[in-house]
Amino acid sequence: MNHTRDIPQTFWRDDRLPWLELRSTWRSRQAYKRHSHPQLSVGAIIEGETRCLCAGQEYLLQPGDLIVIPPHAPHSCNPLHDRPRSYHMLYLDATWCRAQRPDIPPGASITSPQPLLRDSPLFASFQQVVALMCRGSLEQLPARLALLLHALPLCAAAPQAPHHASALLFQRLAMDLPASPSLDKLAHDSALRKETVIRAVKQDTGLTPASLINMARIEYAKTRLRAGDPIADVGYQAGFADQSHFHKTFVSYTAATPRQYAQSRSISDNK
């Protein structure tokens, strides 16, 4: 397996389009832990093959394929037989997506009845978006992305009320992320056995409480890295015990180092 720090990859974003991020990764064998994103994620396989587990289904992705991953859907996309693969990932803010799709009302969950897409014109449209971002053509991006979004098989679903153990965990994470509750504390405060808490949270989110806490910390760390905070401070801000723990956890859930993520390129850099 190649070292994460040596993998050629770039994160493109711009403060003028805060609802958009593009990741481009080349010839990577780096695996992911099961994770989720608050954004709608759309991936394109450029070379190699990827095994994608998403919402309990397995998909074998090949060059020219697109994969649509709804917000908060648990997934992992890993190399096949430890062979390198290259891919782009678009991350689109869920609120922005709803605003572009009148068929998905505010507050509704975004789902995709057909995650795997083998559609050459749609793949070409995705590649055009990537090309615009790499050229720094900022003005054309919103309209082009809206067209792409309208072509994706998305639909609305009523949000499901979480189990009270999950709701309690969400509340504690929002109140004090660095002091996230232990499983013992969560079980005590929800008056449930630890096994019941794990089962309830996993049923609601597809992740264990420990993974959910790690993901919340990673997402917070990403916001601080995007804001330009020093890497040495971000791990502590997010609640990690030390820099080693922060680095290892960040890599395992994002397949990138904190430094790679922090050293992003603005969409307008190439102008």
PLM regions: where:
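Compact structured core domains
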Residues: H81-Q160, S166
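Terminal helix-turn-helix DNA-binding modules in bacterial transcription factors
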Residues: M175, D184, K202-H247, Q263-K271
